[in-house]
Amino acid sequence: MKTLPKEKRYETLSYLPPLSDQQIARQVQYMMDQGYIPGIEFEKDPTPELHHWTLWKLPLFNASSAQEVLNEVRECRSEYSDCYIRVVGFDNIKQCQTVSFIVYKPNQTRY
């Protein structure tokens, strides 16, 4: 029986193979279509009981396309290549984070 390599899983989408830029853009566009405000966070060790994620810049209040968010993800990835990076969606009516998914893992492999 063939099994997947052992690696930490953090969120629902982390059970899928790593997302391509096009797949990330589609997820971000869906999030924006729902009215959520995108933000980018990063963390070296994303274990929930140990750390909080650090917000990359401010949430992208004026983002009008998924490409703008992807550009920020790339910029964050180039500066913090040793960190996990995720995209989050904030609901300004409920005033909470409603969506999040990891878009980059350090030493990421495709299987």
UniProtKB/Swiss-Prot annotation:
It is found in: Carboxysome. InterPro entries: RuBisCO_ssu, RuBisCO_ssu_dom, RuBisCO_ssu_sf. Its main location: other. The keyword Cytoplasm does not apply. GO terms for biological process: photorespiration; reductive pentose-phosphate cycle. The keyword Metal-binding does not apply. Pfam families: RuBisCO_small. Disulfide bonds: none annotated. SMART domains: RuBisCO_small. GO terms for cellular component: carboxysome. Belongs to the RuBisCO small chain family. RuBisCO catalyzes two reactions: the carboxylation of D-ribulose 1,5-bisphosphate, the primary event in carbon dioxide fixation, as well as the oxidative fragmentation of the pentose substrate in the photorespiration process. Both reactions occur simultaneously and in competition at the same active site. Although the small subunit is not catalytic it is essential for maximal activity. RuBisCO folding and assembly commences when the nascent large subunit folds with the help of the chaperonin GroEL-GroES. Requires homodimeric RuBisCO chaperone RbcX2 to assemble into RbcL8 octamers, making RbcL8-(RbcX2)8. The exposed C-terminus of RbcL binds in a cleft in RbcX2. RbcX2 is displaced by RbcS; as RbcX2 is removed RbcS mediates the ordering of an internal RbcL loop (Thr-63-Leu-69) in a catalytically active conformation. Interacts with accumulation factor Raf1; dimeric Raf1 acts after chaperonin GroEL-GroES, binding to RbcL(2) leading to an RbcL8-Raf1(8) complex. The basic functional RuBisCO is composed of a large chain homodimer in a 'head-to-tail' conformation. In form I RuBisCO this homodimer is arranged in a barrel-like tetramer with the small subunits forming a tetrameric 'cap' on each end of the 'barrel'. Heterohexadecamer of 8 large and 8 small subunits. This is Ribulose bisphosphate carboxylase small subunit. It comes from Picosynechococcus sp. (strain ATCC 27264 / PCC 7002 / PR-6). The gene is cbbS.
